[in-house]
């Protein structure tokens, strides 16, 4: 039977050694679901609230015992006897229990853990894989991996202002081959950095964090790696960035400042022209968070300039929230949304954002967080929702590779039904 008989949360660790919430749900038939909740480093100010204890004597104030307590003492008792097969009703109940717009009372980390664990228990009950339960028989598109091979910005100590430099193996014939291409380019880049006497230590998301001179220097090294690995940049493999511009926007000056490298300052219009120059010079297919999350005028300038040429992904801008996404659609701002389950806090709201994006011709990119775990839920969500793109780090660190391995399992299970669309996944770009 599908009725919840047990809900239990505990405090565990994420990939950065910080506490996070793990939730387990059991039904009366013994069906079981467990999930671990991720955590971000660069967070949008409009995100749902990740509840931390603030007790400096434990984990530097980052403990999550309060969120765990909220699951065990408030949420759990409230949903005992409820069906795991009615995800929408369950998520609505969780939202109502919290009663705040940003889930600040119980914590999005508490609510999300319960939401996903319930879905996993439902899948277990029906003897289905999670992607099959969430997406039905039409869940068959494998996503293009946006592999983050160099980390800068808030994700590393390297003197590079852009937060992530990614490769997109769009020319691969399958997901499995796309991962092979990405891994080979990753190793080619490692060899280049080693030869130049640069660090091959990796950042939070598994990409290298070398002491390169600038954003352009970083791009040049990546293009060299693509070539050395035997692939053609601009045909088989493209590049992209998560700029995370909110991290270097100086509110006092009202300007964007490359604080970590050249110290250059830009107005919104000047930064748009800077990006346009990069797009003209390099095989770029995607830019994420090119403007500050509150700089809607700057975002509009960026979209008008480059929106028909490349993917412009809103992460901090939209925070997986249909309210902000609706504003973007109405004003024709950006053309893609980054989807992070813990930015909004329930599976239902996550799928609502994905569907709204698709209806408007925006792509939806399923994403990890910098503080990850061995949990592979986002891999299943990417296939369940046929999003066509996933951003889950580099070809190193088990917390990142776990998602790629799960996607390769799914592709194997799907067999000849599996679809990898490559560049056609970017349906937001005008042909």
Swiss-Prot record:
One of its GO terms (molecular function) is phosphopyruvate hydratase activity. It comes from the Bacteria. Pathway: Carbohydrate degradation; glycolysis; pyruvate from D-glyceraldehyde 3-phosphate: step 4/5. Its cofactor is Mg(2+). InterPro entries: Enolase, Enolase-like_C_sf, Enolase-like_N, Enolase_C, Enolase_CS, Enolase_N. Signal peptide: none annotated. The keyword Transferase does not apply. GO terms for biological process: glycolytic process. It catalyses: (2R)-2-phosphoglycerate = phosphoenolpyruvate + H2O. Its main location: cytoplasm. (2R)-2-phosphoglycerate binds at residues 163, 340, 369-370, 391. Catalyzes the reversible conversion of 2-phosphoglycerate (2-PG) into phosphoenolpyruvate (PEP). It is essential for the degradation of carbohydrates via glycolysis. Belongs to the enolase family. HAMAP family: Enolase. This is Enolase. It comes from Acholeplasma laidlawii (strain PG-8A).
